[in-house]
Curated annotation (Swiss-Prot):
A UniProt-annotated Pfam family: PhaG_MnhG_YufB
PANTHER family documented for this protein: ANTIPORTER SUBUNIT MNHG2-RELATED
Keywords: Antiport, Cell membrane, Ion transport, Membrane, Transmembrane, Transmembrane helix, Transport
GO cellular component: plasma membrane
Membrane-topology descriptor: Multi-pass membrane protein
Gene source species: Staphylococcus aureus (strain bovine RF122 / ET3-1)
Domain of life: Bacteria
Gene: mnhG2
Family (UniProt): Belongs to the CPA3 antiporters (TC 2.A.63) subunit G family.
Protein name per Swiss-Prot or TrEMBL: Putative antiporter subunit mnhG2
Molecular function (Gene Ontology), one example: sodium:proton antiporter activity
Subcellular location: Cell membrane
Membrane-spanning ranges: 11-31, 51-71, 72-92
Subunit: May form a heterooligomeric complex that consists of seven subunits: mnhA2, mnhB2, mnhC2, mnhD2, mnhE2, mnhF2 and mnhG2.
Length: 145
């Protein structure tokens, strides 16, 4: 009985450590990435996983060491994992619609049609026009960069 308690405590500690490490990677990504979209990706994906691992580790620790099952931890785990991606999606969508700066490795729009379905008419031209408008809007707002 004591050995299983130690094993579960070790599993909880490893999950807490992994959650902390992934949160650190998320923080580095937020600082390092160039635009809103990449930063929101770093914040959402890895932070959601780090919160998931951390809360599961805390839940296991409480169950094993105190015999206490926390419904609050379980509910917070569910709500954070449901609302965090949706919230960041809305932030990224608003940034895209407002013409926020979008980092691109190259400005070549010749392969833009691979992102669109084959049944859309004039999709390449529409995508290139949107990219030009976004670039003009970006230059207007971020001309000091």
């Amino acid at each position: 009985m004591e050995i299983t308690k130690e094993i579960f405590s070790l599993i909880a500690a490893v999950m807490l450590l992994l959650g902390s490490f992934i949160a650190l990677i998320s923080a580095i990504g937020i600082v390092k990435f160039q635009d809103v979209f990449l930063r929101s990706h770093a914040a959402t994906k890895s932070s959601t996983l780090s919160v998931l691992l951390t809360l599961i580790g805390v839940l296991i620790y409480f169950i094993v060491n105190t015999g206490f099952f926390s419904v609050r931890l379980l509910l917070s785990l569910v709500f954070i994992n449901l609302t965090s991606p949706v919230g960041m999606h809305l932030v990224a969508r608003a940034a895209y619609r407002n013409g926020a700066y979008m980092y691109r490795k190259n400005d070549d729009h010749t392969h833009a049609s691979i992102l669109l379905s084959s049944n859309e008419q004039n999709s390449t031209e529409a995508l290139q026009l949107r990219a030009k408008k976004r670039e003009e809007h970006r230059k207007k707002w971020y001309q000091n960069d």
